[in-house]
């Protein structure tokens, strides 16, 4: 897109709800300058936090740096496996958000209930990811044009209009 180089790495866990998923995306003006598949420690410019527990995990927090990282965070958190075994379980979303806020500069963590937006406007929480992407794009945190991102949904070919709508609502 936009003649930029890009390297991606997707990794998925195997826990409840399919497990945590991380996607490392690195872009540059020149493909030849990209050598690593993972975002280095303290090198993330942006974290799209679609789940607060995963976003506050060691794997994700390691990538953040107070002087450079923006975080768009879905504030909704579903019960984890701990809910089944602990009758005193409390939703950790607020604690996770506080931990993330401590890792970035003031104002660089923006939290909203992306699941509520996706469910109310599109009828399905599966659209949380493009809602969070759209939110971050509207903040100016994604260095791609709207046209390029909408084209990416077309190239993906999966529920194109719904994903584009979710992005627009973000």
What spans do the regions from the language model cover?
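Active-site cofactor/cluster-binding pocket
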Residues: 1-169
């Amino acid at each position: 897109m936009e003649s930029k180089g890009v390297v991606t790495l997707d990794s998925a866990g195997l826990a409840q709800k399919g497990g945590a998923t991380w996607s490392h995306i690195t872009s540059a003006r020149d493909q030849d300058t990209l050598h690593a598949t993972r975002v280095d420690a303290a090198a993330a410019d942006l974290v799209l936090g679609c789940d607060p527990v995963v976003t506050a995990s060691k794997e994700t927090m390691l990538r953040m740096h107070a002087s450079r990282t923006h975080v768009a965070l879905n504030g909704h958190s579903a019960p984890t496996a701990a809910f089944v075994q602990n009758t005193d379980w409390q939703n950790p979303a607020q604690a996770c958000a506080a931990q993330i806020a401590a890792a970035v500069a003031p104002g660089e963590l923006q939290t909203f209930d992306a699941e509520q937006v996706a469910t109310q406007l599109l009828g399905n929480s599966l659209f949380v990811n493009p809602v969070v992407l759209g939110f971050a794009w509207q903040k100016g945190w994604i260095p791609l044009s709207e046209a390029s991102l909408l084209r990416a949904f077309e190239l993906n070919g999966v529920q194109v209009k719904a994903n584009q709508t979710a992005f627009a609502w973000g």
